[in-house]
Structure formats: structure tokens, C-alpha cells
Amino acid sequence: MKVAKLRVAFLVDGYLAYIQKFMLAYTYIEKGKFALVEKQKPTLIEPTDAIVRVTMGSICTSDLHIKHGSVPRAVPGITVGHEMVGVVEEIGSEVTNIKPGDRVTVNVETFCGECFFCRNGYVNNCTDPNGGWALGCRIDGGQTEYVRVPLANQGLNRIPDSVTDEQALLVGDVLATGFWAARISEIAEDDTVLIIGAGPTGICTLLCVMLHKPKRIIVCEKSEERRRFVQEHYPDVLLTTPEACKEFVVDNSAHGGADRVLEVAGADDTFRLAWECARPNAIVTVVALYDQPQVLPLPDMYGKNLTFKTGGVDGCDCEEVLRLIEQGKIDTTPLITHRFPLSEIEEAYRIFENKLDGVIKVAII
């Protein structure tokens, strides 16, 4: 009897040791294939690292780009996912901005804060080996239970006590993207702003454009379901379809086109639509990530004197975005239409990738 009890105790202890060491992680296997596999839990490598226990994550369209082979830098074998919030479990000796137990957002962009580009505010071009989009692309990301965050002093922001995980979930990527895009578009109060695309990033961009209080906002979206979502939640926004967009924008703007165009759709024909809908001397901000190369037909657009702006999400704004959420000025919780446990992430991806069941954003809990 004692031997049997000892054997059971040994097995239990062994199992506990095993589960303390391993975790489930959704992993990029090869082009076209992700899989949920067991991996060792991460440990600190550099003194600037932090270990975060993921409490909620999400699926981004960029994850689909990795799956389809459209992100050459993506490394097979990495855990995917770069949209997450969590609790700090452990910090390196040089991490001073956060402490164990803090609830934090995780920035999609990691940056050193010291190189030429960081010092000049272009943190998405950070030259550190872990700089730029590393998490869930070049190093293990957050569609898992624990994640190692390099350069944690810059990459983590403490979530205010009054802000929930759901409210903060999109801060580190799509909301920061929309905030950056609206900022660099130089929106004035007399402007007509056209946003092409009403997916998750498009709606986050819309929310951030609304902070600038332009005279008129037009959203162009092909999906009737998503147009209905925008109409229900943001009734002052004008809506159109890609087929009717050019004529609609001309009819609803003062100078023959939109003053500011933000291209967030990333479809085959939306880049051309963006500059065609812009008035002369307008700013066109390209937010989208494309699967295919785009053509810049300079002879066709020469006389329009357009300014194009593009680039990666700016990781400097997350603290300000959290403050705006705390103040009730930004609310992305209506975008979270579906919730799945990590064990059902394959189903979550199926629904998100195929745009089923009215999905906007999926939370992995």
C-alpha cells in the first residue's frame, strides 16, 4: 500500500513538474500551416527581458499574412501572435518601468530607445536585433500561455486599474496603428477624411480619426455586414462601397475629393482607389499590408501633387492610448465579437480568416 502511494505521489509530482515546464503554443510550422504544440515555457535571456503570463490575446490579419507566406521575415517554428495583454511574472535586472504582478499591454513593436531611429521617434525602424516586429514573427509571440518580451522597458505599458483586459487588448497593435495613422495624416477640422476598409484596423483607425473631429468622415467597405456594424456603432459616419466610392466622395467633399485618405483595406485594387479618391494636394496614408506588390502609376497621378505616407505602427503612443481609454474617449470592446479558449484556437482562426458569423475581432482567453 505504501509503495502504491509513493508511486502515485511520484507520478503526481512528475506531472506537476511537467506542466510547470511546458505550455501550449500556436506555432508557424510552414507556409499554409499553423499548429497548437507543446513548448517549454520561456525564461529570461537578457537583463532587459520580462516574462508575461498571457491573460488575453487576439488574432491579427498580419498573422494570416504569415500563414500565407507573405511575411518573408517570419521564422518557421515561432509561436505566432502579437496582440496580447497579461500579467508580469518575472523581470530582468535592468527592467525598471514595470514589476511582477503588473497588468500590461504588450507592444507589437520592440525597440531599444537608444539607436538613431529610436532617438528621432521612428521606433518601428529600430536597429536592435529584436527591433521592429519581432514578437510572433521572428521570435516567439503571444498565442500561448507565457511570452518573453525583450526590451521590456519600452515594450510593456502598465494597464490602469480601471481599464479591463478587453478594453486594453488592442492597444499594442491595431489601435496603436490607427492612432499613428490618424496622427501622421495631419487631419484638420474642415477636412473630409476617407477611410478605405472597415475591418478591425479600419475601425480602430476610424476611432482615432474621430478624435481629430474632422468635418466629415467617409468609410468605404465592400462587406454589407461590416457597413452595418459601422452604421450601428458610429451613426455620424457616411458609408459607401468600392464601386460607388469615387462618385460618392466627390459628391460629399468640397474640393473634388477627400482631403485625407487612409487606406486600410489592403486589397488588390484599394491602393489605386485611395489616390483616385484624393483631391489634388491631399495626403494619402497607407496603413494596409499588401499580399501583392502595388503599382505607383506616376504618369496618371502626376498632376495631383499628392503626399504619400506609409510605414509600420509607431510603438510610442501606447501610454497615451491607454490614457484615452481610461478617460472614456476610445472604446474598442464592441469589436470583440467572439471569444475562444487557446485549446480552440483553430476554430477561432477558421472563423476569423473566413469572416464568418459577423466576426470583427476574436479574443483568445
What are the language-model segments listed below?
Residues C60, V108-N157, D161:
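Cysteine-cluster motifs in flexible loop/terminal segments that predominantly coordinate metals
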Residues S185, R227-T307:
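Glycine-rich cofactor phosphate-binding loops and adjacent beta1-alpha1 units
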Residues P42-G57, S70-R119, P160-V163:
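Glycine-rich beta-strand-centered segment in the early N-terminal region that forms part
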Residues N97-P100, E189, P280:
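Short, flexible surface segments
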Residues G101, D190, P235-D236, G257-A258, ...:
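Local beta-strand N-terminus motif with an aromatic residue
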Residues Y18-M23, K222, E247, R272-E276, ...:
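C-terminal hydrophobic helical "lid"/dimerization subdomain
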Residues R158-E243:
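Mid-domain Rossmann-like dinucleotide-binding core that forms the NAD(H)/NADP(H) cofactor-binding site
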Residues M1-V12:
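Positively charged N-terminal leader segments that act as targeting/secretion signals
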